[in-house]
Amino acid sequence: MKAAILVFPGINRDRDMARALRLISGSEPAMVWHAETSLPAGTDLVVVPGGFSYGDYLRCGAIAARAPVMDAVRDYAAKGGLVLGVCNGFQILCESGLLPGVLMRNAQLKFICRDVHLRVERSDTPFTRGYNAGQVIRVPVAHGEGNYEADEETIQRLEGEGRVLYRYCSAEGVVDEAANINGAAHSIAGIVNDKGNVLGMMPHPENHVEDIMGCTDGRGLFAGLAQHLEKAA
């Protein structure tokens, strides 16, 4: 796996992501500064990590979405390249037009930092093949603006096309208001674009890949990506 991790001013999860990718793939990811106008040759996965790019000024991800490197990411995605955006990365992908919708302030107007449960909705995508459909995983969240919203037509299209890959749920896999930590429409935690090659998700799977963290449920996402890329090579 030859991954490229984007680095913006204010991003603070780039090294967490690099460590996770290194542990799973055995390869050193490239760190790509926001002012670059191209991606490293041979890149097979672009990661937009979490943090607070540009201090979240204007809107979360709004400034980063207009950085020079994002033009290269849009071109890369248009050609079918895999793109993963986590937390602020999800916000950046929405602001850049690579994913529909917007991430709004959490319904309870509080920053949420804790482990949550997610239900994997399907297992036949590059981003979920490391899991089983219906599997419940535990991963951390750390966000103040994770409330995914879109117009009703967009939500229905996402649901109808099976583009909701991860959904907030209880430990038993029940999707209800009590388990919806931030008020997201349809308890949406992660979605893909219409081609299925761009994923945005609010939770942080990169922080649950080692035994020392008490949970390794995040490994499935990265292991699945590695398997997909190995098979495609």
Curated annotation (Swiss-Prot):
Residues annotated as domain Glutamine amidotransferase type-1: 3-233
Pathway this chain belongs to: Purine metabolism; IMP biosynthesis via de novo pathway; 5-amino-1-(5-phospho-D-ribosyl)imidazole from N(2)-formyl-N(1)-(5-phospho-D-ribosyl)glycinamide: step 1/2
Name of the protein in its database record: Phosphoribosylformylglycinamidine synthase subunit PurQ
A biological process term (GO) from this entry: 'de novo' IMP biosynthetic process
Keyword NAD: no
E.C. designation(s): 6.3.5.3, 3.5.1.2
UniProt-annotated location(s): Cytoplasm
Keywords of the record: ATP-binding, Cytoplasm, Glutamine amidotransferase, Hydrolase, Ligase, Nucleotide-binding, Purine biosynthesis
Task of the protein: Part of the phosphoribosylformylglycinamidine synthase complex involved in the purines biosynthetic pathway. Catalyzes the ATP-dependent conversion of formylglycinamide ribonucleotide (FGAR) and glutamine to yield formylglycinamidine ribonucleotide (FGAM) and glutamate. The FGAM synthase complex is composed of three subunits. PurQ produces an ammonia molecule by converting glutamine to glutamate. PurL transfers the ammonia molecule to FGAR to form FGAM in an ATP-dependent manner.
Catalysed reaction equations from the record: N(2)-formyl-N(1)-(5-phospho-beta-D-ribosyl)glycinamide + L-glutamine + ATP + H2O = 2-formamido-N(1)-(5-O-phospho-beta-D-ribosyl)acetamidine + L-glutamate + ADP + phosphate + H(+); L-glutamine + H2O = L-glutamate + NH4(+)
Residues passing through the membrane, by range: none
Subunit structure: Part of the FGAM synthase complex composed of 1 PurL, 1 PurQ and 2 PurS subunits.
